[in-house]
C-alpha cells in the first residue's frame, strides 16, 4: 500500500454533551496532542450506578472534511478506570441537522490501546463519541480518554473502490470469469493490480488472508454471568501478522444484516509488545496499525443467539497462521501450518503463534512450536482441554450444561512468575511444559497450569480474604488427581507427595501439609485462618497463613464426597449456587457463612 499515507485532521474544539468531569481533567485534554494527559469522568458512586450511562463528547473540526476513521487512545496507566469496552461514533455532515447512524465499537481491555473506528464519511463537520461508563467484569466507576484523533484516507481509496468491478464481490478475493490480463491494465492502484494479477495466475495464497468469521458471545458478558474471569478476547484469530505503521487493505462483507460491532484487535505478546483495536465496517477498510502483532477478530454478541457470518480479506497480509480444532485442523494439517509460520517468521523476532482446542487457546513462539511439537499438536491441546474440563466440572458448568463456548487464553510470557492478569494466564519462558506432553505431566506442571487457569475460573463468592490462593488450588488439585493415571503421568500429587515441615516437627515429611492441618486444627486448636500463620513481612499487623494448609479441609471434602462418590456433585452444586448468589455487598464473613450453608445443602 505504498503511497497511501493518511492525513491527520485538525480538531477545533471538544464539548462534553453528557457526563461529568473529575477535577481539572476536562475534555480539552483529549485534543491537546499529549497522550500523557486525559479526560476523566467522576464516579457516580458505584459500578451499579454507572450501568446504562454513557459519556458523550462532541468534537468540531476546523473545517468540513472527508473522514476515513477516528482513533481513540485509552489512558496508558494500568488503572481499571482507564479501560473502556464499548461505545459508538456518529457524525454530522456540513449543512445537515440529523446525525448519521451511530457506528458501534468494542475495545481491548488493555491500557494505552488505540481504538480505531472506521467512519468513511464525506464533508463531516462534527463527530460525537459515546463511551459506555460500565465495563462488564471490570467494575470501573469512571471513564478516561487520553486523545481523540481524526484521519483522512489518501486519494488512492477511490481508485480501489473503482476496481471492484473486476471482482465477484466486495471482498476482492476472487476475479470475475471475464477478467483477462489485458483488462487488468485498467486498474489504477498498484496493490490491487498485483492482487488481481496473482489471482488470475493462481499464485495468490488465501489460506489465512481470506476467511469466514463467526460471532461469539462477549467474553466479558460470559464472565459477568458466571461471576468468573474473562474468557479469551482473542478467540477468533486471523493468522495475520501486522507491522506497525504499514497500511493494510481489509475488505469486509457481511452475509446478512448485522448490528453487532466488528473489530480487529492487534495484540503483540512478545516482550514489550503493545495492543490496539481497530473498528471495521462493511466494504473497504484502510488500516494503519498503531503497533505490530497478531490479528484477531472481535465480533461479540450479548447472548448465545449469534449474528450473521462475515467474510474478511486481508489483502497481502503476512500469514503466520494458526491451528484450530474447531476449524477441522488435525495432526495431518499441522506440519503445513507450522512450515508456513516458520517461513513468515524469518524476519519477525520471537514471532508468536496460536493453537486452539475445544476449551483452551494457547500462544507461544513459532520457534517453540518447531522445537517442541514439530510433527503433531493434537495431544498438546487435548491435555490442556482435559485439565480445564475438570475445572469446569468442579464449577458446576458441566452438570448444568453451562460450559462457555468461549475459550480460555494461556500465553508464554517473558518474565516474572506465572500469573493471571484478568485477560489471560501468563507462563514466563514456558515452552516444554506447555507444549511437550511428557513434560506437562511431570511433577507439579499440571498444578502450575491449573493454578493460573483456576484464578480465571474462581467464582466471585468463593474467593476473597484468605481464599484468593486457596479455592483456585482446589481446581488444580482436583485436575492433578483426576489425571494421575493418564499414560504419561508420574502419578505425583502435590498435597500428598510434596515435603513440608510443619511447626514443631523435627523434619519435613511427604504430605506434611496434611499433617500440619491435623496438628494445628485438632491438637493446637487454632482457628482456620491462623493455622501455620505468621505476621506479614510487608503488611504490618496482618497474619498470613499457608494456602496449602488452608486447602486441606476443602480437599478432604473433595475426597469424601467426590472421590469416594458419596455426593459426586458436591462441589459442582456448591459453586453453582454461589454463581447464582453474587451479591457484591456481602462481607468476607458473610461469604464464608454462605459457603457453609451451601456445603450443608450440597452434602444432604
Describe every region a protein language model picked out.
Residues 47-64, 114, 220-241:
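Short beta-strands within extracellular/lumenal beta-sheet-rich domains
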Residues 74-84, 136-138, 254-260, 303:
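Extended, low-complexity, turn-rich repeat/linker tracts enriched in Gly/Pro/Ser/Thr and Asp/Glu
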Amino acid at each position: 500500500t505504498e503511497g497511501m499515507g493518511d492525513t491527520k485532521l485538525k480538531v477545533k474544539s471538544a464539548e462534553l454533551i453528557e457526563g461529568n468531569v473529575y477535577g481539572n481533567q476536562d475534555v480539552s485534554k483529549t485534543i491537546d496532542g499529549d497522550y500523557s494527559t486525559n479526560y476523566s469522568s467522576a464516579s457516580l458512586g458505584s459500578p451499579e450506578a454507572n450501568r446504562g450511562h454513557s459519556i458523550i463528547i462532541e468534537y468540531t473540526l476546523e473545517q468540513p472534511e472527508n473522514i476515513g476513521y477516528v482513533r481513540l487512545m485509552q489512558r496508558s496507566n494500568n488503572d481499571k478506570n482507564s479501560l473502556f469496552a464499548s461505545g459508538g461514533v456518529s457524525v454530522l455532515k456540513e449543512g445537515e441537522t440529523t446525525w448519521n447512524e451511530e457506528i458501534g465499537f468494542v475495545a481491548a481491555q488493555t491500557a494505552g490501546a488505540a481504538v480505531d473506528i472506521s467512519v468513511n464519511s464525506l464533508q463531516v463537520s462534527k463527530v460525537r463519541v459515546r463511551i459506555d461508563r460500565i465495563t462488564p467484569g471490570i467494575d470501573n466507576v469512571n471513564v478516561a480518554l487520553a486523545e481523540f484523533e481524526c484521519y483522512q484516507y489518501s486519494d488512492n481509496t477511490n481508485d480501489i473502490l473503482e476496481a471492484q468491478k473486476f471482482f465477484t464481490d466486495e471482498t476482492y478475493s476472487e476475479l470475475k470469469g471475464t477478467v483477462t490480463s489485458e483488462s487488468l491494465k485498467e486498474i489504477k492502484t498498484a496493490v490491487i493490480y498485483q492482487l488481481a494479477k496473482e489471482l488470475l495466475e493462481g499464485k495468490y495464497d488465501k489460506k489465512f488472508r481470506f476467511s469466514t468469521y463467526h460471532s461469539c458471545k462477549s467474553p466479558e458478558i460470559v464472565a459477568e454471568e458466571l461471576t468468573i474471569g474473562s474468557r479469551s478476547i482473542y478467540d477468533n484469530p486471523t493468522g495475520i501478522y501486522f507491522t506497525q505503521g504499514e497500511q493494510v487493505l481489509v475488505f469486509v462483507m457481511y452475509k446478512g444484516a448485522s448490528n453487532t460491532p466488528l473489530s480487529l484487535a492487534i495484540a503483540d505478546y512478545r516482550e514489550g509488545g503493545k495492543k490496539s483495536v481497530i473498528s471495521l465496517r462493511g466494504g473497504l477498510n484502510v488500516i494503519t496499525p498503531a503497533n505490530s502483532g497478531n490479528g484477531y477478530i472481535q465480533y461479540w454478541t450479548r447472548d448465545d443467539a449469534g449474528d450473521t457470518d462475515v467474510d474478511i480479506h486481508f489483502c497481502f497480509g503476512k500469514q503466520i497462521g494458526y491451528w484450530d480444532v474447531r476449524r477441522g485442523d488435525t495432526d495431518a494439517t499441522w506440519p503445513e501450518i507450522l512450515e508456513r509460520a516458520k517461513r513468515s517468521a524469518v524476519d519477525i523476532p520471537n514471532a508468536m503463534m496460536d493453537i486452539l482446542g475445544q476449551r483452551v487457546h494457547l500462544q507461544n513462539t513459532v520457534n517453540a512450536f518447531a522445537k517442541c511439537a514439530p510433527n503433531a499438536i493434537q495431544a498438546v491441546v487435548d491435555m490442556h482441554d482435559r485439565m480445564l474440563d475438570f475445572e469446569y466440572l468442579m464449577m458446576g458448568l458441566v452438570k448444568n450444561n453451562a460450559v462457555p463456548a468461549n475459550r480460555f487464553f494461556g500465553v508464554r510470557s517473558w518474565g516474572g512468575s506465572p500469573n493471571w492478569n484478568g485477560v489471560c494466564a501468563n507462563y514466563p519462558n514456558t515452552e516444554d511444559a506447555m507444549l511437550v506432553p511428557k513434560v506437562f505431566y511431570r511433577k507439579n506442571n499440571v498444578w502450575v497450569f491449573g493454578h493460573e487457569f483456576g484464578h480465571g475460573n474462581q467464582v466471585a463468592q468463593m474467593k476473597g480474604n484468605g481464599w484468593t490462593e486457596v479455592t483456585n488450588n482446589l481446581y488444580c488439585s482436583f485436575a492433578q488427581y483426576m489425571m494421575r493415571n493418564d499414560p504419561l503421568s508420574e502419578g505425583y500429587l502435590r498435597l500428598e507427595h510434596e515435603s513440608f515441615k510443619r511447626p514443631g516437627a523435627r523434619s519435613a515429611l511427604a504430605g506434611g501439609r496434611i499433617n500440619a492441618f491435623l496438628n494445628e486444627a485438632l491438637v493446637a486448636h487454632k482457628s482456620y485462618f491462623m493455622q501455620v500463620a505468621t505476621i506479614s513481612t510487608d503488611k504490618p499487623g496482618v497474619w498470613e497463613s499457608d494456602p496449602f494448609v488452608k486447602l486441606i479441609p476443602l480437599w478432604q471434602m473433595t475426597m469424601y464426597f467426590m472421590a469416594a462418590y458419596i455426593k459426586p456433585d458436591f462441589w459442582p452444586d456448591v459453586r453453582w449456587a454461589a454463581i447464582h448468589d453474587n451479591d457484591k455487598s456481602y462481607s468476607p464473613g458473610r461469604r464464608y457463612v454462605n459457603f457453609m450453608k451451601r456445603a450443608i445443602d450440597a452434602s444432604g
